Design a protein with these regions (language model features):
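Active-site-adjacent core segments of small-molecule enzymes
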Residues: 1-259
Length: 259
């Protein structure tokens, strides 16, 4: 995925997303629209520079219905503008989505602890940046990787140890790893496969991801996550309605014979 409101090619620098959907997950869920899944949503930056729900609201309001300069002033006063500029400055062309670190940026429960998630690539095979950056080079590099090699990641958590220095309602603040080390809890393996097929693209288009697709024990917390759950649900309904498709929860059988 990308963060730009308009779809752009892979040759445009942007924030990239990574979503994981576990199947066959039994237990009480935060949202009732999927009963057997657990989703993890991450992006390739460890913060959301705007940070707070109020500023996200103001961003939409001032950029669409009022004067964007007012919002720029608000960002400057609250110290967010420099974070946005630094993020833009540090954007680069990635070699492949399978070679990138990803972060949840927002917090979740982990039993009685509050954590953030981190995904670190560990594959032996690494893609190379092509000389000609086409609009589909990331997809092509990912497909070339998975044709002959599996992709692997370490899935880690970072536990909140100080609620003032590691707030739940400001995603622009980095949780200091010197004060809370990251801990590996799982390995993610993506097997050798051909994913660029009509059937797989159709399945992907029918899927919905949300922080709310979660066990209560791993529920999303904080203002931003609360808003995301509601917004993602409405966006999914809108997208499925536009495609004349019903909302759909996948199961293991969807992947047994897919081409």
């Amino acid at each position: 995925s990308n963060s730009n409101p308009k779809t752009k090619g892979d040759n445009s620098k942007d924030i990239r997303g990574f979503a994981i959907k576990l199947l066959g997950v039994d237990g009480e869920k935060c949202e009732s629209n999927e009963s057997g899944t657990q989703d993890f949503l991450l992006i390739n930056t460890n913060i959301m520079p705007i940070g707070t729900l109020k500023l996200f609201h103001d961003a939409i309001y001032y950029m669409t219905k009022s004067n964007p300069l007012i919002f720029g002033g608000e960002l400057l006063i609250q110290g967010k503008l420099v974070k946005i500029l630094n993020l833009i400055k540090n954007m680069k062309h990635e070699t492949s989505p399978l070679d990138v670190r990803y972060f949840s940026t927002t917090p979740y429960m982990f039993g009685d602890k509050i954590v953030k998630y981190i995904l670190i690539p560990t594959s032996t095979y690494k893609s190379k940046l092509p000389k000609n950056l086409t609009a589909t080079y990331l997809s092509e590099n990912m497909q070339n990787h998975l044709k002959k090699h599996e992709a692997t990641f370490d899935f880690l958590i970072q536990i909140q140890t100080n609620e003032n220095e590691m707030p739940t309602n400001d995603a622009s603040i980095t949780w200091d790893i010197k004060k809370s080390k990251i801990v590996k809890v799982a390995t993610l393996k993506i097997p050798i496969q051909i994913f660029a097929t009509k059937e797989r693209y159709k399945l992907a288009e029918n899927l919905s991801f949300s922080p709310g697709h979660s066990l209560i024990e791993h529920r999303p917390i904080g203002d931003i996550n609360e808003a995301r759950v509601k917004i993602y649900e409405e966006m999914s309904k809108f997208r499925h309605s536009g495609n004349s498709e019903a909302l759909y929860e996948p199961s293991n059988k969807d992947f047994y014979h897919i081409k």
